[in-house]
Amino acid sequence: MSFDHLLTSSKRRELLQNLGIGHGSDVFSTGLFRKAECNAETAISQRSIPRANPDHLRPIFDRFATKEIKGKKLMTPEDFIRGYLGLYTEENYNKETVRLLASAADTTKDGDISFEEFCAFEALLCSPDALYLTAFELFDRNASDTISCDEFEAVIRHTQPLHDQDFDFSSEFIKRYFGADKQRNVNYHSFCQLLHDFYEEQGIQAFKRYDKNGNGTISSLDFQQIMTTVKGHLLTDFVRHNLIAVSGGGASGHKFSDTRGGFVTFPYYAAFNSLLAKMELIKRVYVSTTRGNLDIEMTKEEFLHAIQSYTQVTPYEVEILFHLSELNHPGRKTLCLKDIQAIDPERLKRVSQMDRLINIKAVHHKDDRGVGTAFLESAYRFLLGSVAGACGATAVYPIDLVKTRMQNQRTSGSFVGEVMYKNSLDCFKKVVKFEGLLGLYRGLLPQIVGVAPEKAIKLTMNDYMRDKFTKDGKIPLYGEIIAGGTGGMCQVVFTNPLEIVKIRLQTAGEVQQAGKKIGVFTVLKELGFLGLYKGSRACFLRDIPFSAIYFPAYAHAKLASADEDGMNSPGTLFASAFIAGVPAAGLVTPADVIKTRLQVAARAGQTTYNGVIDCARKLIKEEGPMSLWKGTAARVCRSSPQFAVTLLTYEVLQRLFYVDFAGSRPTGSELATTKTIQDESSTNPDHVGGYKLAAATFSGIEHKFGLFLPKFETSK
């Protein structure tokens, strides 16, 4: 919807008419209704929740409407608020509050809600500024499209803060909005600004009331009284319980010059309230600076540097913020997400760029994690790692076969026809020519069976060890290296037996033996149990350095390629995993060559090797130092895409099949953002369309604007 023109109150009601009733209705042409035109198609694009079909709303309305006049069903305020929305269901509910809330839907202000009004309010709740529109309807008591001073005062005096702290409705603040004689009415946009500024003015008046000497100071107890009555909607339990301590009236050792001796100056009072009102901005600065890593703790100096581009936040407010943070964890002068959430009642939610196929919250809080939860988390990672490993291995298996053939090719000795392949491309062509396309996948089954647990245990152990080394959201480089190396070491117990079987099958096609078909069981019978671990030292020599190089490189590549919110798209995940594989695969090629020579079955006339050192010595002596780097290109071309596919699949699966164990998540997989009103939508099947947000909207009016309405009738 275009807002190039001023959205006046009358135009707003026109929008409600067209959205709520549809074409052909003349209901809004009678009585106190205003009628006009609206581009409903453009309005639809602005709604964050789909509109309900009036045909679906009709039976719902008829079921809850208990009043009937001349054959037309109507909802009373009690029908709408208590019956349909399920609010204020207590026996001693405040009747004026229920009537006032229902008046938001009662466009004619006649005390009842018709079906047309019911539909119109559903449309209003779908609009982007539903919070302010609903508040405007609460104050517009005579359906005039404007708010008079008397209307504003009547509603404000019914709110809970005015029961505890009076307000001067003859002040200059009120006169600036309603005129010196208070006879000027305000329209919708002016009302929005009035509502925004009112509670700041109310706080100033409350301060003046307690500042009896007029010297700009109040006591800590007076400060607590003002904050709990006038500013109660800004307080969490943590802040409410620490008001005396933070204002210098308690035992806290941290005292500001403006809060010494149990007194609070107006600058401190203003900065404190301003900070609470800006907590949403504080949260955004923290999330942006930490690049989505919500476990990082920031120092005051780091935070001051981060807010340099935000002129709205003053150093005084930051000082108060870190004082509150220190009260949350005495002895540590840092700021973390827990501190922000202790100060700000609005919670962050974590969202992914992908729609989750599964969304399970296994643990509601990190403190609830136990041994069983940690085990389930590792099992979850192991399962996804197995699938990811199988995908990665299948994708690059032909390259792996070429690499193995090239590394096993001898370039010296008397064996006739030993040099079969000129290079990797020649090897690929000859395999396809003499063994067919399926020859490129010879030995794939044991490879998949092996790679599934191999990659799973490597990924799981790396994640597990990274969790152990991570403190305050940060992990040192040596911790990353040890975590990666541990993952590589643990995988060898799975890798070695399956690698040797894979290599025997991959090289079996080079020289065919008449009448002898070589399969998995043939190789197992020939090797025996101990033979399956032949060359295990070379496996350790290859896999530990590879993982110690790969995982830190991958983590840093992800961080470098993340967007400003710390998010990694599938493209950057693949690129990061691919790039990390180049140095990791290339630098450990000598160990891979030695492992291959030890595990392959030597044919008649070929050199045999007795261990890692003997193999390395004979290779250098017989084939030259460069023989240790045979197949480097093929290995890099195989390992880089394999791990790129594996890590991409592993992280994407964690996003699609989301299970929250209250532990660490892969960096860059989630964006931390504030919960919106849509996150509080009703699950009641009768609450369709905009009515999913009705209760959350009324609650938002209370907590955003401080319009706390009394729930119960007061005794006379």
Swiss-Prot record:
<feature type="binding site">
    <location>
        <position position="146"/>
    </location>
    <ligand>
        <name>Ca(2+) 2</name>
    </ligand>
</feature>
<feature type="binding site">
    <location>
        <position position="140"/>
    </location>
    <ligand>
        <name>Ca(2+) 2</name>
    </ligand>
</feature>
<feature type="binding site">
    <location>
        <position position="213"/>
    </location>
    <ligand>
        <name>Ca(2+) 3</name>
    </ligand>
</feature>
<feature type="domain" description="EF-hand 2">
    <location>
        <begin position="127"/>
        <end position="162"/>
    </location>
</feature>
<feature type="repeat" description="Solcar 3">
    <location>
        <begin position="568"/>
        <end position="656"/>
    </location>
</feature>
<dbReference type="Pfam" id="PF13405">
    <property type="entry name" value="EF-hand_6"/>
</dbReference>
<comment type="subunit">
    <text>Homodimer (via N-terminus).</text>
</comment>
<feature type="binding site">
    <location>
        <position position="215"/>
    </location>
    <ligand>
        <name>Ca(2+) 3</name>
    </ligand>
</feature>
<keyword id="KW-0106">Calcium</keyword>
<dbReference type="InterPro" id="IPR018108">
    <property type="entry name" value="Mitochondrial_sb/sol_carrier"/>
</dbReference>
<feature type="region of interest" description="Linker loop domain">
    <location>
        <begin position="346"/>
        <end position="362"/>
    </location>
</feature>
<dbReference type="GO" id="GO:0005743">
    <property type="term" value="C:mitochondrial inner membrane"/>
</dbReference>
<dbReference type="InterPro" id="IPR051028">
    <property type="entry name" value="Mito_Solute_Carrier"/>
</dbReference>
<dbReference type="InterPro" id="IPR002048">
    <property type="entry name" value="EF_hand_dom"/>
</dbReference>
<feature type="binding site">
    <location>
        <position position="108"/>
    </location>
    <ligand>
        <name>Ca(2+) 1</name>
    </ligand>
</feature>
<feature type="binding site">
    <location>
        <position position="211"/>
    </location>
    <ligand>
        <name>Ca(2+) 3</name>
    </ligand>
</feature>
<feature type="binding site">
    <location>
        <position position="222"/>
    </location>
    <ligand>
        <name>Ca(2+) 3</name>
    </ligand>
</feature>
<feature type="transmembrane region" description="Helical; Name=3">
    <location>
        <begin position="485"/>
        <end position="498"/>
    </location>
</feature>
<comment type="function">
    <text>Mitochondrial and calcium-binding carrier that catalyzes the calcium-dependent exchange of cytoplasmic glutamate with mitochondrial aspartate across the mitochondrial inner membrane.</text>
</comment>
<feature type="repeat" description="Solcar 1">
    <location>
        <begin position="376"/>
        <end position="468"/>
    </location>
</feature>
<feature type="binding site">
    <location>
        <position position="110"/>
    </location>
    <ligand>
        <name>Ca(2+) 1</name>
    </ligand>
</feature>
<dbReference type="InterPro" id="IPR023395">
    <property type="entry name" value="Mt_carrier_dom_sf"/>
</dbReference>
<feature type="transmembrane region" description="Helical; Name=5">
    <location>
        <begin position="574"/>
        <end position="591"/>
    </location>
</feature>
<feature type="transmembrane region" description="Helical; Name=1">
    <location>
        <begin position="382"/>
        <end position="399"/>
    </location>
</feature>
<keyword id="KW-0812">Transmembrane</keyword>
<feature type="region of interest" description="C-terminal domain">
    <location>
        <begin position="665"/>
        <end position="716"/>
    </location>
</feature>
<feature type="domain" description="EF-hand 3">
    <location>
        <begin position="165"/>
        <end position="195"/>
    </location>
</feature>
<protein>
    <recommendedName>
        <fullName>Probable calcium-binding mitochondrial carrier K02F3.2</fullName>
    </recommendedName>
</protein>
<feature type="binding site">
    <location>
        <position position="106"/>
    </location>
    <ligand>
        <name>Ca(2+) 1</name>
    </ligand>
</feature>
<feature type="binding site">
    <location>
        <position position="117"/>
    </location>
    <ligand>
        <name>Ca(2+) 1</name>
    </ligand>
</feature>
<dbReference type="GO" id="GO:0015810">
    <property type="term" value="P:aspartate transmembrane transport"/>
</dbReference>
<feature type="domain" description="EF-hand 1">
    <location>
        <begin position="93"/>
        <end position="121"/>
    </location>
</feature>
<dbReference type="GO" id="GO:0042802">
    <property type="term" value="F:identical protein binding"/>
</dbReference>
<keyword id="KW-0496">Mitochondrion</keyword>
<feature type="transmembrane region" description="Helical; Name=2">
    <location>
        <begin position="443"/>
        <end position="462"/>
    </location>
</feature>
<feature type="region of interest" description="N-terminal domain">
    <location>
        <begin position="1"/>
        <end position="345"/>
    </location>
</feature>
<dbReference type="GO" id="GO:0005509">
    <property type="term" value="F:calcium ion binding"/>
</dbReference>
<dbReference type="InterPro" id="IPR002067">
    <property type="entry name" value="Mit_carrier"/>
</dbReference>
<feature type="binding site">
    <location>
        <position position="142"/>
    </location>
    <ligand>
        <name>Ca(2+) 2</name>
    </ligand>
</feature>
<dbReference type="GO" id="GO:0015813">
    <property type="term" value="P:L-glutamate transmembrane transport"/>
</dbReference>
<feature type="repeat" description="Solcar 2">
    <location>
        <begin position="475"/>
        <end position="560"/>
    </location>
</feature>
<feature type="transmembrane region" description="Helical; Name=4">
    <location>
        <begin position="535"/>
        <end position="554"/>
    </location>
</feature>
